[in-house]
Amino acid sequence: MECYEQSRQRAAFVVLLFIVMLGSQAQAQLRTDFYSDSCPSLLPTVRRVVQREVAKERRIAASLLRLFFHDCFVNGCDASILLDDTRSFLGEKTAGPNNNSVRGYEVIDAIKSRVERLCPGVVSCADILAITARDSVLLMGGRGWSVKLGRRDSITASFSTANSGVLPPPTSTLDNLINLFRANGLSPRDMVALSGAHTIGQARCVTFRSRIYNSTNIDLSFALSRRRSCPAATGSGDNNAAILDLRTPEKFDGSYFMQLVNHRGLLTSDQVLFNGGSTDSIVVSYSRSVQAFYRDFVAAMIKMGDISPLTGSNGQIRRSCRRPN
């Protein structure tokens, strides 16, 4: 009996080791020079389009960054969020966390069109999302990084998964945030650093109404200023947008964390990062050192880009980001 139990434990260990090796192998296939021979002009081509779009509308930088996040947290960084509905599946665009909220699809289409003309059938939509996220941060004054590439695109999307709570709602508690990020291999420090993306961008009234009218851990003058464009009545001004960082809304810096220390986080999921909990010290450190924030944000973005990529012969290189081949 004891011998059988030992054999069973060894078998379970071998299976676990195999799974870990498969995950490591997939990540190992991602590399920064993946397209250096097959599409050498990829990076400057993407940069030019993102630069043009950010020049037209600064807000689009935050939208492109968020698009990558919402893709990676639903079955991995596989560009499933870009797929339109088909007869065989309902896509993720109209799921609760994305509907009337996630933007930037047309920018990805424009980039894909240009890249296809240069290097047909070579570059995945998933990799384009990763590059545009990096370029958006850079163009708003943040620190860049070398993007690991080699992802392939999914051939399906999942409305139900996108709606299942894997994407943190704006009313999240700290425990909920920690658990959701941990499920994707991201630490509490990674979570706080990635939340710093809210140093740019805007949120709709419907996502922060409860906070500005009902919260007690909020600066009163801040709450009053936000109420001017966000009426208390549900259905009134739901889509009115407010900037997330009052101080430097168009600069990727550490101001977001200074706002949290002063109880001026716009979303509940922002302020819970500094509310007497386990992440308070991280917020304080970022509020005092933008370089510490930049360092950890870059590391967390690279880790997020490693979430369950399709590599090798898995998935496909879509000709259009909106539909499978």
Curated annotation (Swiss-Prot):
Co-factor requirement: heme b; Ca(2+)
Residues carrying Pyrrolidone carboxylic acid: Q29
Top-level taxon of origin: Eukaryota
Any single biological process term in GO: response to oxidative stress
Keyword Transcription included in the entry's annotation: no
InterPro entries: Haem_peroxidase, Haem_peroxidase_sf, Peroxidase_pln, Peroxidases_AS, Peroxidases_heam-ligand_BS, Secretory_peroxidase
Chief localization: secreted
Keywords of the record: Calcium, Disulfide bond, Glycoprotein, Heme, Hydrogen peroxide, Iron, Metal-binding, Oxidoreductase, Peroxidase, Pyrrolidone carboxylic acid, Secreted, Signal
Residues that hold Ca(2+) 2 according to the record: T199, D245, T248, D253
EC number(s) given by UniProt: 1.11.1.7
One Pfam match: peroxidase
Note: There are 73 peroxidase genes in A.thaliana.
Role played: Removal of H(2)O(2), oxidation of toxic reductants, biosynthesis and degradation of lignin, suberization, auxin catabolism, response to environmental stresses such as wounding, pathogen attack and oxidative stress. These functions might be dependent on each isozyme/isoform in each plant tissue.
Protein name per its UniProtKB record: Peroxidase 68
